[in-house]
Amino acid sequence: MAKVSAVEKNKRREMMAKRYAARRARLKAIVMDQKVSLEERFKASIQLAELPRNSARVRVRNRCEVTGRPRAYYRKLQMSRIALRELGSLGHIPGVVKSSW
């Protein structure tokens, strides 16, 4: 199990990223638009830099829903390889069977 503080910190980052997503996207669009004047683009880039660091989606780490483990994460199942193996062998994941050949 991951530290509870690390999992909670990641949840706060997710919430902050959602809260600022629209504002961040709008400012990024202005910065990348070549038709907008250079001065306005510069103002937008400064405003973008003034946003909280944790409001960027890049700062959010994918974590296992079961254990909170940050590594060996399967996006499709939203869990780590270890939790997948345990739950799969117990038969809690539909369609997952032990392989034999």
From Swiss-Prot:
Function: Binds 16S rRNA, required for the assembly of 30S particles and may also be responsible for determining the conformation of the 16S rRNA at the A site.
Pfam families hit by this protein: Ribosomal_S14 (PF00253)
Native source organism of the sequence: Bartonella bacilliformis (strain ATCC 35685 / KC583 / Herrer 020/F12,63)
GO BP, sorted A to Z: translation
GO cellular component terms, semicolon-separated: cytoplasm; small ribosomal subunit
Family: Belongs to the universal ribosomal protein uS14 family.
MF terms in GO: rRNA binding; structural constituent of ribosome
Name by which UniProt lists this protein: Small ribosomal subunit protein uS14
Keywords: Ribonucleoprotein, Ribosomal protein, RNA-binding, rRNA-binding
Quaternary context: Part of the 30S ribosomal subunit. Contacts proteins S3 and S10.
Superkingdom field: Bacteria
NCBIfam families (alphabetical): PRK08881.1
PANTHER family: 30S RIBOSOMAL PROTEIN S14, SMALL RIBOSOMAL SUBUNIT PROTEIN US14M
